[in-house]
From Swiss-Prot:
This is UPF0178 protein RHE_CH02229. Belongs to the UPF0178 family. It comes from the Bacteria. CDD domains: PIN_YqxD-like. Pfam families: DUF188. It comes from Rhizobium etli (strain ATCC 51251 / DSM 11541 / JCM 21823 / NBRC 15573 / CFN 42).
Length: 155
């Protein structure tokens, strides 16, 4: 199963393309604005506007062998802890070897913004980011399918 933190996710078309190629189900989770799909392998879940509602929905369901796409580091922390494969929309993989540093850097950035030491700018999403995401996401989907085959479970 693929879970996508879909609010402001710039790689939804890429997720669909790779998921279709691998025959994997996709669940897009957002608090508004999802385009309906007729594809039986695609599910849209609209959650409340409550703080972290989409993150909580995904974290409560994602488990070992699932693939999660999110730019939200706290959600990535929760999903990595369950054994899910996690990628950001720029192709950055979050795993047990780097999630602690990613979380610390996020917290440091938040602190610097609060104290006025940083303006908190985010780089724009580039074609290179999209390409890197496609490569990373395809690799994670293959790993998820391989794990499902080894354990007899669903990807």
């Amino acid at each position: 199963m693929i879970y996508v933190d879909a609010d402001a996710c710039p790689v939804k078309p890429e997720v669909l393309k790779v998921a279709e190629r691998h025959g994997l189900e996709v669940t897009f989770v957002a608090n508004s604005g999802l385009r309906p799909s007729r594809d039986p392998m695609v599910r849209n879940v609209i959650v409340s506007n409550a703080f972290d509602a989409a993150d909580n929905w995904i974290a409560e369901r994602a488990g070992a062998g699932d693939v999660v796409v999110t730019a939200d580091v706290p959600l990535a922390v929760r999903c990595v802890a369950t054994g899910a494969f996690v990628s950001g929309p720029t192709g950055r993989v979050f795993d047990e070897t780097n999630i602690g540093m990613a979380s610390a850097m996020r917290d440091l950035g938040a602190h610097l913004r609060e104290t006025g030491e940083s303006k908190g700018y985010n780089a724009s999403f580039s074609p290179k980011d999209r390409s890197r995401f496609l490569e990373t996401f395809d690799r994670l989907c293959r790993r998820a399918k391989s794990l499902a085959g080894e354990t007899g479970g669903r990807p």
